[in-house]
Each structure stands twice: as structure tokens, then as C-alpha cells.
């Protein structure tokens, strides 16, 4: 039997990082077993559906390199793979369950259902349908239909006994039928299927062998198993993945930080870092490494390595991964990755519409200008310096701004180190001007030794010597390595900035 899995998101928002993990685990399982990875669009929630969200889904998977074998715009032997185009199929199978006695017509209107909910809430009863229409006679059903009363189709959940299934991660599970949400709707009065009907029918017709989804769907699984049995179909192997939590133990949400893949991408996380980190959320690998490429993961992924406990999303750890992957980039690659952030930052002024038309470069649906030869030459010089300090691509602009703009002279209290007074700091800056020509052509280590010798001669720490120089040359506490920065900026410009700071602040 060939393994066949699916990622079946609802395009009701930008792709959540938790959804990305579900897609990734399904993709990796399929590739590790030589199987098929299907992309199915579950767009039956038309009030929240958006074409933008659907396109974002395709863009996200393509950017991450998670190529699907069937579904989406690609199509395939089970087309269509978009649920809103399969309504006739769902109606047919809903009717089949009614005809077999496993489902029934329900004519209760919204007012009655609201009253039931209020009574249940007042009496602290579990919510759910009271099965008022479950035992209507054929004559009663016909009479209501003849009157044109709208109806839904509900699943007839057994009143006694239990439903059992085996989860690949959680083991054998048994659910008392009396605890299953009573008689859920399968087909709405407008002909739209609910998730439960469409999901089961599509998984069967598309030959899905394994259903890997978040553990939040576990309570729905007994009902799905009941439906499989009612149809006479073999259920797939279920595998409910551990939840992705914030550091407070709550489900990951915007209050914890970025949650959509779009946000991570726009902040400047690399796809390699996202793939690597997300693949480790709730899963371990036998060789115990930190760094895995997508091709590595395709070979190593195994359901037996999944963890039952929830996975905590650690933003700092993801940032660490991002930094590691940035250091693996060549200078040319890093320039290509960072340039869109610089170009769109306004560092080189606003871009008018005519310039945009001539630009010819795209990034996240934004047009940006190509760099001038001079801009690229300067930035290529700084790439080796920033590579060790960047954690996010979006940090690049503030790191290189001093090379293209004259920074404002910082206030004296920001220039003066905590352990020095104003007079000593002034002497540091004067000494830096004096020895600046000596660092011409030196690398960071050799140039740093020139400054270290002066710091030692003054009886102060190296950091207390370098900080005032860095602040006056770059205007910031954070910059590429100082000696290299001065070499790129030019010693004359660096001296002028220090002289200006002395004149204005000391």
C-alpha cells in the first residue's frame, strides 16, 4: 500500500506556523515512505474565506519547498481538490447515510436551538442537540418537507456502547458514545457540508492512508470513525500531533509574538531556519544534531520519533537557527537576501511610481529598486562584517545606515561609558583620531590591537575605549565590527564624525 497523506487547510487567514508544522510533517512522512502528499482546500467556511488567504497558502508552501503531488492548482486524478467545487458529492453521501439509517433530517430552526443552548447553560448541562428530530416518522418528515420547512442532515450517533480506534502516536483510544457531541450536523440547510462530512468523504475518495493533524481534532475522531463504519469504509491511520504552545503553556497565538509564516518571512527569517526549527517542534531525530536540511529531514522523519507532550515555541531558538543559516550564506547570497529590506526601508529615499515601473524587482508583492553600482559595492564590503551579527534580515538597514547617512551626534550620556567621566572620554576620542591612520588596511584583529594598545596605555578597558568611538562614528551601540566599519566608511569621514562629536558634546 502506498502511503498517501494530505494537508487540508481552511483559507480563513494567513498560514499559521502551527499549520506549517502540520504540512511539513505530512510532507516529510510522505517523502520518507515514497508516498504522495496531497493539498486539499477546505473552503466551506465562506464567511471567512478569502482568495488572498488561499493564494498565501500556495505561496507559503512553495516558498518553503513543500511541493505537493496532487491538489491545488496542480490538480490530479481526484480533482477537484477544492471542497466548494464538490458539493454534489457531499449531498450524495449525506443522503446515503440517511437511506441507510445512520443519519436523519432535522427541521429545528435556529430559534429553537438557541433556546436549548440557553437552557443547557442555565442548568450547567453539556451543550449539544437534544435529538428532537431523531425519531420522526416517514409521514412526519414528508409533511414537513411538503411545507417547505428547511432541514439539515445530522449523524445518528449510537446512544450506547463505545467507539475505539488506534492512534499512531497516542495508542489505543476508547470513547463512550454518550460523551460524543450528540448528532452533529453533516449537511446544512443551504447544501453546504460541514467539516466532518466533507473531510471523511474526501479522505476516502482520495485514498488517504494516514491522517496527521493537530490534537485539537482528537475529540472529533470518534464521530469520524462512526461515519467510516456507517459508510462501510476502512478508516485511515490517525496520528494526532502534539499542540504548539507559547511559553506560558497556552496555545500559540499573537499575544506570544508572530504566528503566521508571512510575519516570520517579512521579519527576515530564512526558510531553511523555519523548516529546521518547525521540524523539531514535537519531534526528535536519532542522530541528535541541531541542523537539518529539508532533504535530511525527508530521509530521517519517522512517526515513532514524535512526542506526545505539547511543543513550546521558542522564538529565541528560532532566531538562533536563523543566525546559523545566515552565516552559511555567501556574501553575494546574503546581499541578495538583505537588499529588499534595505531598498524598502526608505534609506535611499521614497520611490515614486515611475521608478517602481522601471525597478524590475519583486519581494513579498512589493516592488523595489535595483541597487546602484556604488550601493552594491559598499554593501558587498559590509556583508562579511554583518554576517556574524545578523539574526534577522530585517536588522540589516540599521546596521548599515551609518554608511549612507550622516548620523546625528548622540547625547553625551550615550557616548560616555559608565566607568569613565567626560574628560577621560574626550581623551579617548582624541586618541582615536590620533591613531586612526594606523589602522588603514588592517583587518579587525590587527586594527583592534592598535586600539587595545591605546586603551592599555590609558589604563582603561578595551570596551570602554571602543564604545565612544563606535557611538560617534556609527551613531549606534550596535554596528558591524568597528575597524571594518571605519575602513568601509573611510578614515577621513570617521575622523570628521569624531571631531564633530567632541565639538558638540565635550
From Swiss-Prot:
SUPFAM superfamilies on file: An anticodon-binding domain of class I aminoacyl-tRNA synthetases, Nucleotidylyl transferase
Binding site for ATP: 254
Alphabetical list of CDD domains matching this protein: GluRS_core
Keyword vocabulary terms for this entry: Aminoacyl-tRNA synthetase, ATP-binding, Cytoplasm, Ligase, Nucleotide-binding, Protein biosynthesis
Motif range ('KMSKS' region): 251-255
A biological-process GO annotation: glutamyl-tRNA aminoacylation
Intracellular or extracellular location(s): Cytoplasm
Keyword ATP-binding recorded: yes
Motif 'HIGH' region: positions: 9-19
A family per Pfam: tRNA-synt_1c
HAMAP family: Glu_tRNA_synth_type1
Family: Belongs to the class-I aminoacyl-tRNA synthetase family. Glutamate--tRNA ligase type 1 subfamily.
Job of this protein: Catalyzes the attachment of glutamate to tRNA(Glu) in a two-step reaction: glutamate is first activated by ATP to form Glu-AMP and then transferred to the acceptor end of tRNA(Glu).
Protein name, UniProt field: Glutamate--tRNA ligase
Amino acid at each position: 500500500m502506498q502511503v498517501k497523506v494530505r494537508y487540508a487547510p481552511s483559507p480563513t487567514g494567513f498560514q499559521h506556523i502551527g499549520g506549517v508544522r502540520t504540512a511539513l510533517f505530512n510532507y516529510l512522512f510522505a517523502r520518507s515512505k515514497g508516498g504522495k502528499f496531497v493539498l486539499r482546500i477546505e473552503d466551506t467556511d465562506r464567511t471567512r474565506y478569502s482568495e488572498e488567504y488561499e493564494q498565501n497558502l500556495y505561496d507559503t508552501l512553495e516558498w518553503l519547498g513543500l511541493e505537493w503531488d496532487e491538489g491545488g492548482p496542480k490538480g490530479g486524478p481526484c480533482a477537484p481538490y477544492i471542497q466548494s467545487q464538490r458539493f454534489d458529492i457531499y449531498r450524495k453521501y449525506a443522503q446515503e447515510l440517511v437511506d441507510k439509517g445512520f443519519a436523519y433530517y432535522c427541521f429545528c430552526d435556529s430559534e429553537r436551538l438557541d433556546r436549548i443552548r440557553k437552557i443547557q447553560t442555565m442548568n450547567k448541562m453539556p451543550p449539544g442537540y437534544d435529538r428532537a428530530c431523531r425519531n420522526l416518522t416517514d409521514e412526519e418528515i414528508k409533511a414537513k418537507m411538503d411545507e417547505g420547512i428547511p432541514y439539515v442532515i445530522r449523524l445518528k450517533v449510537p446512544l450506547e456502547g463505545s467507539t475505539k480506534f488506534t492512534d499512531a502516536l497516542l495508542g489505543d483510544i476508547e470513547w463512550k458514545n454518550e460523551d460524543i457531541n450528540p448528532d452533529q450536523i453533516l449537511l446544512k440547510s443551504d447544501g453546504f457540508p460541514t467539516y466532518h462530512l466533507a473531510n471523511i468523504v474526501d479522505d476516502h475518495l482520495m485514498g488517504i492512508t494516514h491522517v496527521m493533524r493537530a490534537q485539537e481534532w482528537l475529540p472529533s475522531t470518534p464521530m469520524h470513525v462512526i461515519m467510516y463504519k456507517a459508510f462501510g469504509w476502512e478508516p485511515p491511520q490517525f496520528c494526532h500531533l502534539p499542540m504548539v504552545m507559547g511559553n506560558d503553556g497556552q496555545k500559540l497565538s499573537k499575544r506570544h509574538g508572530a504566528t503566521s509564516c508571512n510575519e516570520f518571512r517579512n521579519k527576515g527569517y530564512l526558510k531553511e531556519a523555519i523548516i529546521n526549527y518547525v521540524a523539531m517542534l514535537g519531534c526528535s531525530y536519532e542522530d541528535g544534531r541541531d541542523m537539518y536540511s529539508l532533504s535530511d529531514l525527508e530521509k530521517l522523519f519517522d512517526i515513532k520519533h514524535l512526542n506526545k507532550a505539547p511543543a513550546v515555541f521558542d522564538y529565541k531558538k528560532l532566531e538562533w537557527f536563523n543566525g546559523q543559516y545566515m552565516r552559511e550564506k555567501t556574501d553575494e547570497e546574503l546581499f541578495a537576501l538583505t537588499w529588499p529590506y534595505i531598498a524598502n526601508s526608505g534609506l535611499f529615499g521614497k520611490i515614486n511610481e515611475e521608478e517602481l515601473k522601471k525597478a524590475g524587482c519583486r519581494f513579498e508583492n512589493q516592488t523595489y529598486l535595483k541597487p546602484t553600482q556604488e550601493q552594491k559595492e559598499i554593501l558587498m564590503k559590509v556583508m562579511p562584517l554583518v554576517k556574524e551579527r545578523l539574526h534577522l534580515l530585517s536588522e540589516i538597514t540599521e546596521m548599515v545606515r551609518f554608511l549612507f547617512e550622516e548620523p546625528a551626534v548622540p547625547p553625551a550620556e550615550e557616548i560616555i561609558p559608565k566607568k569613565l567621566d567626560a574628560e577621560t572620554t574626550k581623551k579617548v576620542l582624541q586618541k582615536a583620531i590620533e591613531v586612526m591612520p594606523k589602522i588603514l588596511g588592517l583587518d579587525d584583529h590587527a586594527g583592534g590591537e592598535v586600539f587595545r594598545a591605546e586603551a592599555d596605555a590609558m589604563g582603561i578597558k578595551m570596551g570602554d575605549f571602543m564604545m565612544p568611538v563606535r557611538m560617534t562614528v556609527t551613531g549606534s551601540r550596535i554596528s558591524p565590527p568597528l575597524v571594518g566599519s571605519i575602513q568601509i566608511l573611510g578614515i577621513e569621514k570617521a575622523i570628521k564624525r569624531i571631531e564633530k562629536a567632541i565639538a558638540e558634546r565635550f
